[in-house]
């Protein structure tokens, strides 16, 4: 059964799969499930009450060429070893895209281990993932067209994750990380940008030409 999880306590049931699938340090996983899971969404596939496949949608407010829009960072995409290659992930993404369109989310982004895993679903590389952070937020706002807006929650989490990285206990990243994006509601994207793109691909081509800053802070 495919379902959306929004309740904090219910989200804890996905931790087992998270730790099976990813090599993040225990201290980071503790932080993720106590803090990041306060306001994110999860789309899961369950069998007999057990989560066998999942993805997480972590919310961010993004400056999209002068317009503040809600977006999601797609993370923790995983399926149990025994149930891979059975279509669970395809169905989870299908449900996620339905929810995102219903919510009128212009686009979402992710950091892939391999681009080919997501390209067939309409995700395309839009920029490199920045590992050397620009500390001056004003400079970011002056220089870039697309970036995450730093509200109080963002700053608190950024500082917490800085601490983990300083202790070498941060999230494990792939080599040469990139950011991929997908247009999830073309009408909302056109409204936010003042454009009139007729296809997702056309909108992504336009987005790729912009100066985009997405850093370890996510």
Indicate residue ranges for each PLM-predicted region.
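A short, internal acetyl-CoA/4′-phosphopantetheine-binding micro-motif in the GNAT/acyltransferase core
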Residues: 74-84
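Short coil/turn motifs at secondary-structure junctions
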Residues: 60-62, 82, 115
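Long, hydrophobic, well-ordered secondary-structure blocks that form the structural core
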Residues: 107-132
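Conserved GNAT acetyl-CoA-binding A-motif
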Residues: 93, 98-112
């Amino acid at each position: 059964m495919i379902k959306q999880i929004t309740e904090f306590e219910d989200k804890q049931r996905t931790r087992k799969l998270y730790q099976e699938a990813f090599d993040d340090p225990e201290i980071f996983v503790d932080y993720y499930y106590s803090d990041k899971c306060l306001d994110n969404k999860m789309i899961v596939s369950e069998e007999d009450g057990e989560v066998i496949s999942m993805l997480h949608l972590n919310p961010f407010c993004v400056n999209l060429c002068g317009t503040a829009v809600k977006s999601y960072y797609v993370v923790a995409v995983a399926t149990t070893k025994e149930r891979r290659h059975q279509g669970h992930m395809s169905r989870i993404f299908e449900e996620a895209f339905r929810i995102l369109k219903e919510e009128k989310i212009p686009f979402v982004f992710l950091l892939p281990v391999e681009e080919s895993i997501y390209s067939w679903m309409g995700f395309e590389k839009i920029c490199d993932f920045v590992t050397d952070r620009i500390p001056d937020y004003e400079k970011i706002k002056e220089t870039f067209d697309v970036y995450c807006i730093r509200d109080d929650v963002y700053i608190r989490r950024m500082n917490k994750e800085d601490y983990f990285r300083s202790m070498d206990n941060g999230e494990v990243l792939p080599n040469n990380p990139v950011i991929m994006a997908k247009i999830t509601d073309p009408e909302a994207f056109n409204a936010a940008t003042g454009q009139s793109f007729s296809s997702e691909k056309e909108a992504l081509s336009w987005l790729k030409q912009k100066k985009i800053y997405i850093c370890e802070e996510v």
